[in-house]
Amino acid sequence: MWRIMMKSKLHRATVTAADLNYIGSITIDSDLMAAADILPNEKVQVVDNNNGARLETYAIPGPAGSGVICANGAAARLVQPGDIIIIIAYGIFDDREARTYQPRVIFLDARNKITAVKKGEQPGQVWV
């Protein structure tokens, strides 16, 4: 059996821009993509903590060290600058690997700088 599991996530990223006229995707600082093991054009889920919106799109790299998180295309209708979001990447694992895999969780501050890198999540853990 194959299982779709969280592979990694960028936790509490701050949206820096929204470009309705771009053809699609979410632009993410390439340093953050590398930290979260997200490849260019990889499918990601975006969860907006401000309004509850959820969407799927693909990641494109932004300038390294810039902190850019830009919702492009239709996503700009759901995610606005200043919103706090979670960007989640998933992987497909066989049953055995799924039971032991520990996802990489990248915690960010308000300027999208990495504050912590953790493996896995603990039930009841709160990070604000």
From Swiss-Prot:
SUPFAM superfamilies tied to this protein: ADC-like
Binding site for substrate: T57, G73, A74, A75
GO MF term list: aspartate 1-decarboxylase activity
EC number: 4.1.1.11
Family: Belongs to the PanD family.
Record's function text: Catalyzes the pyruvoyl-dependent decarboxylation of aspartate to produce beta-alanine.
Name listed for the protein in its UniProt record: Aspartate 1-decarboxylase
Phylogenetic placement of the source organism: Bacteria, Bacillati, Bacillota, Clostridia, Moorellales
